[in-house]
């Protein structure tokens, strides 16, 4: 009986440890800052702050389910930001058309990543790392390192606008999360993505077009970067050639931390959202406690290390 109890506790800890950890850090900050942490305005602030991260993480989740990685997340976000800014400011294009072209460009960059990985056969780490340098180089060459400003006022709706008192970026985040969740769990593409990540050889033997689905997973990631770029540029009201670069590590952390939730070490959308919340709550709570920005990275690093450790345990038990 004791063995069963210990086994049950251990299984629960590895399966739902991320959710429990999220609840614990919320409780800790609620105790440390009882008059500010759980205020509605602060909750909205956290959701607003993680909106870009969650959207980038959603796209990256699809790629990582296949067992691959996309290291161009930050570079692509920066590049699409500059593209949209250039279309609106340098070419006088309509805001909505510029955003649509930006999303299409994000999909194209994702397709290029997918093609190099799936069809040319370059390892995903090397392929996306190299592509990231290329994207960043072209981005810096076009802007010469200078941001694009004087954006149309209407463009601010994505990053600063609100509907019924809730920021538009939060609506965009939840719509993206729901759409990707449905795609992964209710469509043939989603089933194929999970099959490829589970056992690529078996997926290929069962008739799944592995190369096509890999390419499409990177397309989804690229589109997520484009949507994140729209919110980021709108919020800053400027398009900086390196504005999205800082999101690379946080996006990876979000997916890795989320992989320990709900699906035994596999990346999943619900987990990614929890991962984004953990990163957001840590940043917000530590800021409320007057912890320096640099020290916050120590906390994030510890959380990522813990998450990867739990994920490794989960995967070894599955084997």
Residue ranges and their predicted role:
Residues 18-30, 59-61, 132-137, 172-183, ...:
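Hydrophobic core segments of alpha-helical transmembrane domains in multi-pass membrane transport
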Residues 35-45, 139-142, 184, 188-190, ...:
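Inter-helical junctions in multi-pass inner-membrane proteins, predominant
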Residues 24-91, 116-121, 253, 257-269, ...:
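Single transmembrane alpha-helix segments in multi-pass membrane proteins
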Residues 1-27, 204-212, 284-319:
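Cytosolic-side transmembrane-helix boundaries in multi-pass membrane proteins
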Residues 120, 124-186, 213-216, 235-244, ...:
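Transmembrane helix-bundle core of multi-pass membrane transporters
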Residues 4-12, 69, 90, 107-148, ...:
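Short loop segments and helix-boundary regions at transmembrane helix junctions
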Residues 225, 235-301:
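Transmembrane alpha-helical segments in multi-pass inner-membrane proteins
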Residues 93-99, 108-113, 117, 164-239:
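Helix-loop-helix "hairpin" substructures at the membrane interface of multi-pass membrane proteins
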């Amino acid at each position: 009986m004791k063995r069963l109890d210990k086994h049950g506790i251990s299984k629960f800890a590895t399966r739902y440890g991320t959710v429990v950890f999220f609840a614990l850090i919320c409780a800790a900050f609620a105790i440390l800052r009882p008059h500010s942490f759980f205020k509605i305005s602060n909750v909205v602030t956290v959701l607003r702050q993680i909106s870009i991260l969650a959207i980038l993480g959603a796209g990256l989740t699809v790629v990582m389910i296949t067992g691959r990685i996309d290291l161009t997340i930050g570079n692509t976000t920066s590049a699409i930001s500059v593209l949209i800014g250039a279309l609106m400011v340098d070419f006088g294009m309509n805001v909505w058309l510029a955003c649509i072209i930006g999303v299409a460009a994000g999909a194209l960059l994702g397709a290029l990543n997918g093609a190099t990985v799936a069809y040319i056969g370059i390892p995903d780490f090397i392929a996306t790392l190299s592509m990231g340098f290329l994207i960043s180089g072209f981005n810096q060459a076009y802007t010469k390192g200078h941001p694009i400003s004087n954006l149309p006022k209407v463009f601010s709706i994505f990053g600063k606008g609100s509907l019924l008192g809730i920021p538009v970026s939060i609506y965009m985040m939840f719509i993206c999360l729901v759409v990707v969740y449905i795609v992964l769990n209710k469509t043939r593409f989603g089933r194929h993505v999970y099959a490829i990540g589970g056992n690529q050889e078996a997926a290929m033997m069962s008739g799944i077009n592995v190369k096509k689905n890999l390419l499409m997973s990177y397309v989804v990631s690229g589109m997520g970067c484009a949507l994140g770029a729209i919110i980021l540029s709108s919020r800053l009201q400027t398009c900086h050639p390196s504005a999205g670069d800082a999101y690379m590590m946080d996006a990876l952390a979000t997916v890795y931390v989320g992989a320990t939730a709900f699906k035994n070490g596999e990346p999943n959308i619900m987990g990614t959202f929890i991962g984004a919340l953990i990163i957001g709550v840590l940043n917000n709570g530590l800021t409320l406690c007057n912890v320096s920005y640099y020290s916050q990275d120590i906390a994030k690093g510890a959380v990522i290390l813990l998450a990867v450790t739990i994920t490794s345990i989960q995967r070894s038990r599955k084997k």
